C-alpha cells in the first residue's frame, strides 16, 4: 500500500462533494509528473484530500483509490477546459484513477499546522520544489501524522482559520456541477511575461 496527496479546489469539487457522490474519477490532471504518480497507484492506496486555492489551504479529508488506469473522458470533450485536441479514442493521452470517500477530518489541517509539525518537515507539499503538483506521494509516517492532527483541535489562534476552511468545503449553492467538469488544481504553466519595452529617449538636436 502507498500513500498520496491529491489537490482539489473545493468550490469546484471538495471533500463534501466526494462524500455526496461516494466515488469519483480524478479527471483533469494535465501534468505528466502528476499523471506518472497516478499510474503508480494501486487499488487500496490511501489519499489525503487537499483543498487548494482557499484560505488557508490544507487537508480536509481522506479518500481511497478504488480503480486505476481509467481513461480521462474530459480530454475528448471540446467544451471542457481539459480538452486535448491531440488525444484520440485509439490513442488517449490522459488517464486517471477513481477514488472513494473515506472520511472528513474532524479538524481541518492547514498548511501552517503542517509546517509547525516536525514529523512533516520533509513532506513534498511543504517544499519549494514539486509542491504545486496536484498529485504527490507521501510517506506512511506523514499520512498518519496528518490524520492524527486532524483529530486534534487546533491550538489557540488557529481555530478561526480552521473553521473558515471547513466552511469552504461546502460549495456555494446554485446550479449543480455537471459530472466530468473538473475540480483538480491545475498545473498549467503561465506563459512567461514579455519584457516591457523601454521608452525611447528623445535625441538632443
Regions found by a protein language model. Give the residues of each.
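GIY-YIG nuclease signature motif recognition
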Residues: 6, 62-66, 139
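Hydrophobic beta-strand signal
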Residues: 48-49, 64
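Classical protein tyrosine phosphatase
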Residues: 57-61
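Charge/polar-rich, low-complexity and marginally structured segments
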Residues: 104, 119, 131-158
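RNA-binding accessory domains that recognize and position tRNA/RNA substrates
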Residues: 205
Amino acid at each position: 500500500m502507498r500513500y498520496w496527496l491529491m489537490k482539489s479546489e473545493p468550490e469546484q469539487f471538495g471533500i463534501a462533494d466526494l462524500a455526496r457522490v461516494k466515488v469519483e474519477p480524478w479527471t483533469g490532471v494535465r501534468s505528466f509528473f502528476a499523471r506518472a504518480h497516478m499510474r503508480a497507484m494501486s487499488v487500496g492506496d490511501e489519499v489525503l484530500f487537499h483543498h487548494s486555492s482557499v484560505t488557508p489551504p490544507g487537508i480536509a479529508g481522506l479518500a481511497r483509490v478504488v480503480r486505476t488506469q481509467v481513461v480521462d473522458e474530459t480530454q475528448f470533450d471540446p467544451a471542457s477546459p481539459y480538452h486535448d485536441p491531440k488525444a484520440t479514442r485509439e490513442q488517449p493521452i490522459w488517464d486517471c484513477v477513481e477514488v472513494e470517500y473515506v472520511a472528513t477530518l474532524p479538524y481541518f489541517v492547514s498548511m501552517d499546522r503542517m509546517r509547525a509539525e516536525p514529523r512533516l518537515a520533509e513532506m513534498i507539499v511543504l517544499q519549494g520544489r514539486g509542491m504545486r503538483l496536484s498529485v504527490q506521494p507521501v510517506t506512511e509516517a506523514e499520512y498518519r501524522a496528518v490524520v492524527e492532527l486532524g483529530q486534534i483541535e487546533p491550538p489557540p489562534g488557529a481555530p478561526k482559520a480552521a473553521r473558515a476552511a471547513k466552511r469552504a468545503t461546502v460549495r456555494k449553492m446554485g446550479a449543480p456541477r455537471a459530472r466530468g467538469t473538473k475540480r483538480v488544481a491545475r498545473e498549467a504553466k503561465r506563459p512567461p511575461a514579455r519584457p516591457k519595452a523601454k521608452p525611447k529617449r528623445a535625441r538632443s538636436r
